[in-house]
């Protein structure tokens, strides 16, 4: 019986400010209109695994779906086996586990004199009819922040012969994300990211990851 778990790790570097919204259920007068999601323990920005998974799946659907899928449950088999499918007749658990990504270079930012790991960007919309202004404050994780990124991929008898194909899809997803954006307001310059120090490691069982590491660093 084959059973192994592969950890895919990388660093996400923010090339522009990133906004992934947090809770604004309570906002005092003068507070930021749209705060970013933060770790409740440290109050430092995080990148939720759900945001990474959802964005990557959406981008890959444009490549690997033969037709436009109205819902994720209508995705192609290759995406369903990686990300999961909740549709009754096609239900399956995904082979990928996405972890939340936490800030990893706080000390470096501190040494540069950074006083806060977030910034506030002031934006404005103008009503074209009334010329009324609608100013708002958007919080962003700052440029040059890096976050530890981690995926867990499970290998069993069922997918032992599909591992390399799956990792090519993962590689494509990372490249597409670099060419797109993460979080909100990407068309206005937010959320440009780069994946660095890509590495696959066997963390349970026996599996030679040499070929996988070659795939991850190959040009798309």
Curated annotation (Swiss-Prot):
Mutagenesis or variant effect for residue 100 to A: Nearly wild-type degradation of target ssRNA by the Csm complex, crRNA is shorter, Csm complex is altered
Keyword field: Antiviral defense, Endonuclease, Hydrolase, Nuclease, RNA-binding
GO MF terms held by the record: endonuclease activity; RNA binding
Keyword match Lipoprotein: no
Cofactor, how bound (note): Endonucleolytic cleavage of target ssRNA by the Csm complex requires a divalent metal ion; Mg(2+) has the best activity in vitro, but Mn(2+), Ca(2+), Zn(2+), Ni(2+), and Co(2+) also support cleavage.
Enzyme Commission code: 3.1.-.-
Known outcome of mutating residue 119 to A: Wild-type degradation of target ssRNA by the Csm complex
Subunit and interaction comment: Part of the Csm effector complex that includes at least Cas10(1), Csm2(3), Csm3(5), Csm4(1), Csm5(1) and mature crRNA. The Csm complex is elongated and slightly twisted with a maximal length of 215 Angstroms and a diameter of 75-80 Angstroms. It has been modeled to have a central protein filamant of Csm3 subunits along which the dsRNA helix of paired crRNA and target RNA binds. The filament is capped at one end by Cas10 and Csm4 and at the other end by Csm5; ssDNA is thought to bind to the N-terminal HD domain of Cas10.
Family classification: Belongs to the CRISPR-associated Csm3 family.
Protein name: CRISPR system Cms endoribonuclease Csm3
Organism: Streptococcus thermophilus
Gene from which the chain derives: csm3
